[in-house]
């Protein structure tokens, strides 16, 4: 009888755990939310209040110049001018390799921050991670042709090439 009770108890514990297993992805990949932008780390990384904690958001589909790179500070200022202190909606798309939330940030007027930074010429459409995004592709093309933002430079160095060079790897555009 004791063995039977013990087996039943173990099975109940396992079932209780499995019954809540569907909650795990929710914890790992948060749902969309609204919060105030409390920090701008660089052109493509923000901190947004999610409840009582600041969550680091990596803007998906774009790549801005690095802090120490040409146009890096201008990209950061553009993101700050557009979003800092504002109540935004974060549309989450999972986590990146640094455990930052990937997402699109919608400004109070409905404007997509990711797209606006590309439109203003402060970043690249990140083809590697958003290969089918024809909106970002078109916005980058328009900014290049208009020679606005970093596109005033006839041959700007992409952030991924800049990062490689900083690590001592060969510089290829």
Residue ranges, per PLM feature:
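Small beta-barrel nucleic-acid-binding modules, primarily SNase/OB-fold domains
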Residues: 2-173
């Amino acid at each position: 009888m004791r063995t039977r009770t013990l087996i039943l108890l173990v099975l109940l514990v396992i079932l209780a755990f499995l019954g809540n297993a569907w909650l795990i992805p929710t914890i790992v990949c948060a749902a969309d939310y609204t919060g105030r932008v409390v920090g701008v780390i660089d052109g493509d990384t923000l901190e947004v209040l999610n409840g009582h904690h600041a969550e680091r958001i990596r803007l998906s589909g774009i790549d801005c110049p690095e802090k120490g790179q040409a146009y890096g500070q201008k990209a950061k200022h553009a993101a700050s001018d557009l979003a800092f202190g504002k109540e935004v909606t974060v549309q989450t798309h999972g986590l990146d390799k640094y455990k930052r939330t990937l997402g699109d940030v919608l400004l109070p007027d409905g404007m997509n921050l990711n797209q606006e930074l590309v439109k203003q010429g402060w970043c690249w459409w990140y083809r590697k991670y958003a290969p089918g995004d024809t909106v970002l592709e078109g916005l980058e093309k328009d900014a290049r042709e208009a020679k606005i933002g970093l596109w005033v430079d006839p041959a700007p160095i992409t952030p991924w090439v800049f990062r490689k060079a900083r690590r001592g790897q060969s510089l290829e555009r």
